[in-house]
A protein has these predicted regions:
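Alpha-helix-loop-beta-strand connector modules within alpha/beta enzyme cores
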Residues: 14-37
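Glycine/Thr-rich beta-alpha phosphate-binding loop at enzyme active sites
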Residues: 1-21
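Glycine-rich phosphate-binding active-site loops on the catalytic face of alpha/beta enzymes
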Residues: 4-9, 54-70
Length: 118
C-alpha cells in the first residue's frame, strides 16, 4: 500500500485529503496491479470513488468498524440495558456492536462497488 496522505485512525480536522497526483503516478507505474488504500476511515465518498477509479481495489476501514461497534455498545450500556434481566450477558451486551459493524460493512460494500462480487 502506498502512502498518498492517508493515515490509520481518525483524520485530523485540518487533513487536506488524498494526493491523487501521487496515486495516479503510482497507477501509471504499476499498470493493472490492484492497489490497497490503508486508512480508509473518514475519507469522503467522492475521494473513495476517485481512488477506486485510479486503481484502488481494497480499502481498509477497520477504525470505522471499531467506532461503530463502540458507539452501539455505549448506547446499549447508557440506556441501562445491561442492568435489565440478563442484559449483562456478553452475547447480549455485544450484540448491538456486532450489528453496527455489519451495517457499516454493508454500507462500505455499496460504496466500494463490491456487492455481488466474490
Amino acid at each position: 500500500a502506498a502512502g498518498i496522505v492517508n493515515i490509520h485512525g481518525k483524520y485530523p480536522a485540518n487533513w487536506a485529503g488524498l494526493s491523487f497526483e501521487t496515486l495516479d503516478a503510482i497507477q501509471q507505474l504499476t499498470g493493472d496491479m490492484p492497489l490497497v488504500l490503508h486508512g480508509g476511515t473518514g475519507i469522503p465518498e467522492d475521494m473513495i470513488k476517485k481512488a477506486i477509479a485510479l486503481g484502488v481495489a481494497k480499502i481498509n476501514v477497520n477504525t470505522e468498524c471499531q467506532l461503530s461497534f463502540a458507539a452501539a455498545t455505549r448506547k446499549y450500556i447508557e440506556a441501562g440495558k445491561d442492568l435489565e434481566g440478563k442484559g449483562f450477558d456478553p452475547r447480549k451486551l455485544l450484540a448491538p456492536g456486532t450489528e453496527a459493524i455489519k451495517a457499516t460493512v454493508k454500507e462500505k460494500m455499496e460504496l466500494f462497488g463490491s456487492v455481488g462480487k466474490a
